[in-house]
Structures are given as C-alpha cells and as structure tokens.
Amino acid sequence: MKDLTMLLDELKDMSFFNKGDICLIGCSTSEVIGEKIGTVGSMEVAETIFNALDVVSKETGVTFAFQGCEHINRAITIEKSQYNPLTMEEVSVVPDVHAGGSLATYAFQHMKDPIVVEHITVPCGIDIGQTLIGMHIKHVCVPVRTSVKQVGQAIVTIATSRPKKIGGERAKYK
C-alpha cells in the first residue's frame, strides 16, 4: 500500500512517533477497500497495515494499540507489557473479524502477549476510515495535517495532543 507507506514516512519525518509512546490505531479495512465500515473486512489488508506499523515500531520505539469496533465498545488491544492496572481495566473479549474488526483481530493474533482493555488514554493516534478514535486520545486533541488524505479508499484523520491551558486572564503559557 503505497499511500500507507507515504503516510507513515511523512509522520516519521515530522517526528510524530516518539520512543516509549503508545500510538492508537483505528482502522476499517472495509473502508480501505472502498466498502462501508463494518461490512466486509479484510484480514489481508489488516496484515499489510499491521506489518507496516511493526516496521515503524522497530524504527522509532513507538508502540501501537489497536481499537476494536463498536461491537466490543471500541476496546483496545495492547501488549501486556503496556498494561497499567492503575489506569486501565482489562476486559474479557477476543477481537473477531465480525466483532472487533479485522485489524484488531490480526493484532491480537500476532502480538507477543496481547490483552484487551476497556479504555486507554494515549498521546496520539491514526484513524483510518473514520473509526472514531478521539475517545482514547489525551486532552487536548490536536489535528495533524499530512499530504496523504486517504489509505486506499479510507479517509485518514491523525491526532496528537497538547497539555491543557488552564487558568484565567492572569495565566501565562509557554
């Protein structure tokens, strides 16, 4: 997928991925192949995307988390090594192509020691196909603009975050 490679290269060039961070991926493989979200899914597309992200992880030190679909309440598949019981709650579900989505399913099958958590708060994310990842992005969510607007036929939305600016009229900010 040339557009996926171009997108990931552009994000690497702008230092979007940071060592030790978790980046959330939401993806509708149905949308990537030009179909309505949640209708057909593709494990082949999921494999391609997962493998491309794995390369980025090895190059940059970022870890990826994978959002499931609404049928599992957009639960997140992560490596157990990333699990923090103080801020995350593990749930009993295994993503499936028809209840979780192809990419979350593929990730669960190919991660070293996967678990699924109900909610996560991460500093950045990539949404391929309008899967609504915003609920898991740290406040304050900031859009990231790239020259790549689609992966396959799916619209891509990218977000990072910044600290909240709090205070009143006397407050000063960096």
Swiss-Prot record:
<protein>
    <recommendedName>
        <fullName>UPF0340 protein SaurJH9_2150</fullName>
    </recommendedName>
</protein>
<comment type="similarity">
    <text>Belongs to the UPF0340 family.</text>
</comment>
<dbReference type="Pfam" id="PF04260">
    <property type="entry name" value="DUF436"/>
</dbReference>
<dbReference type="InterPro" id="IPR006340">
    <property type="entry name" value="DUF436"/>
</dbReference>
<dbReference type="InterPro" id="IPR028345">
    <property type="entry name" value="Antibiotic_NAT-like"/>
</dbReference>
